Amino acid sequence: MDTVFRVATAGDEAAIRQLFVEMLRTIFHTQEVEGYPAGYVGRFFTGGEDEILVAEQAGAVVGFLSLESHREGEPPFLYLDDFSVAAACRGQGIGFRLLDMAEEYAAALGLGEIHLHVERDNLGARRLYQRWGFGVLAEQGARLLLGKKL
């Protein structure tokens, strides 16, 4: 099936919210999770440097990656916040393409690094990031801060 990759629009918000809940359920192994607070996703549609990238198949959003530009401190970096691919679509290279797009976006903004957090026990995600060249910058309780120089 063909996958279209693009920047999200406000019309994608419901699908992004659903994928976020699916991601939380996978990470925390429970159905009892809360989604984004009201207004959170809308901040990505204001025309600033923060964006959400989406993957779409047959008109449905099947993956997303939210990007936040951080220019305070040195070095400036792109932070990958939330990242989810629908369970039925995993293994198709969607995650790799979204990461590739994030790198392209960081370079276009002149940001030399990418940072993200991952849960220590999310071994699948940790393997994905390791294959993509991320290393551990800091251990922060149940999470690891990972980084990659571009």
Each PLM stretch: what is its role?
Residues 3, 7-81, 86, 99-101, ...:
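Acetyl-CoA-dependent GNAT
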Residues 96, 120-138, 144-145:
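Conserved active-site alpha-helix within GNAT-family acetyltransferase domains
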Residues 147-150:
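Short beta-strand-to-coil "C-cap" segments at the C-terminal boundary of structured domains/repeats
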Residues 85, 91-104, 127, 131:
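Conserved acetyl-CoA-binding loop-helix of GNAT-fold acetyltransferases
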Residues 74, 92, 123:
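Loop/helix-junction capping segments adjacent to catalytic residues or to phosphate/diphosphate-binding pockets
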Residues 106-117:
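Conserved GNAT acetyl-CoA-binding A-motif
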